[in-house]
A protein has these predicted regions:
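Conserved C-terminal structural/oligomerization subdomain of aldehyde/semialdehyde dehydrogenase
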Residues: 1-101
Length: 101
């Protein structure tokens, strides 16, 4: 287990995104750019559970951590993580007391 850091030169952003997404894994990625709006657009197209922009490894207990593809299943942290450890149950109670025998 370890990070993968491919460093290649590209002329077309669509090719970059296609290459980045052409993997069985999708835990996390990072986009580095002086143009934050463009970086956000690129981040939205990456098939990963987490994308950092101009930084890496920032996280909080409120932020869900979930991998895409073969990078795991389920989620940790945040409301999504809490749901992984719960099992919903519905209990119905009649409105009238006549229903109780």
């Amino acid at each position: 287990f370890g990070p993968i850091l491919p460093m290649m030169r590209f002329d077309d952003i669509d090719e970059v995104i296609a290459r980045a997404n052409n993997t069985d894994y999708g835990l996390a990625g990072a986009v580095w750019s002086a143009d934050i709006e463009r970086a956000v657009q690129i981040a939205g197209r990456l098939e990963t559970g987490t994308v950092w922009i101009n930084e890496n490894l920032q996280s909080t207990p409120l932020t869900p951590l979930a991998g895409h593809k073969q990078s795991g299943f389920g989620a940790e942290n945040g409301i999504y993580g809490l749901r992984e450890f719960t099992q919903p149950k519905a209990i119905y109670i009649p409105k009238s007391s006549d229903a109780v025998a």
